[in-house]
């Protein structure tokens, strides 16, 4: 146990195939640190009762693991503080951070083309005590799209889950945790399903068209849930981040597919887009160099597009947000784009960070308003504990982004 703990901790600093996924423990760094401290104390007590080389070695290895883990955790905390974040120390433990279930889960579309039922998870805006803002005796929200205390509009945050385009739904742990948090800040938060790819169904076109459908549904229903879809931001992680970027930039280009009447009248204007570890380079995602993850990741890309980049290059190009940014740059439209936020771990083993670096370069070339953060010693799903240091950093920056874009919460 001591040897494995030391090796796994060392792999947080030095790349070790397979073991370096220990970085994914980062979201629970405080818990892992506490466990290691207990193990060190147990090992010290055992050595005191029965001294020996094996017990001394166990103490040494566990202490090494404790020191390395503390160092990695401190580096992430220091990074968060450098962004102006005042960390909630209790949230770092992950206790109580998983988020509540949605208040309602209405059907958005019974998708006959895919055979999948697409729903929305709706988290109603909360007051400072956790109560639904403007709720009456039935618990229903105010239906004006305005704050119960003022005439200011209540912004809407729409979330798109990750899962390699083939897994997950509106209740993914990261999505649920962040949606509940946005609602606690006074926003109307809505997480949308989109059709998942299967071995027999490539959804590279359908997923984007159904997200557009979901947004049109939000525009038609937000007021009934106490929000104003004229002030709307998109949020997405991993594959959901790809979809959020794609929809935002396609809307700017006027390339969104027409939506069915069943969805709603039209897709609302997207005012801001905030992503975590997005798939910005679909080819790079397929060609993931990680020795362990590569087969699983490339299979998801092939399932989504029904082929490899060599077999269907046009499909990989069609889902690449950087290509849309290049078109926007050519047309001089970059400066008028909605502001974009990207936060990505420098040691992401699932979605290579080089995709985000190239996306950042494309945004810079286009002159688009954006903020890109590459977090040190951080892997994929750093918000699996939504209260982790990096998740809190992303939240802090996202609130700044929403304020910049005039997507504001209810006054409480």
Regions found by a protein language model. Name each.
Residues 12-24, 112, 284-330:
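Mobile cap/lid helix-loop segments that gate and shape the active-site cleft of serine hydrolases
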Residues 2-46:
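Membrane-embedded alpha-helical segments of integral membrane proteins
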Residues 335-336, 342-344, 348:
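Short beta-strand/loop motif that positions the catalytic acidic residue
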Residues 18, 22-28, 79-141, 145-151:
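N-terminal cap/lid segment of alpha/beta-hydrolase-fold proteins
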Residues 216-288:
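Primarily recognizes the serine-hydrolase "nucleophile elbow" in alpha/beta-hydrolase
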Residues 349-358:
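Conserved alpha/beta-hydrolase "acid-adjacent" motif
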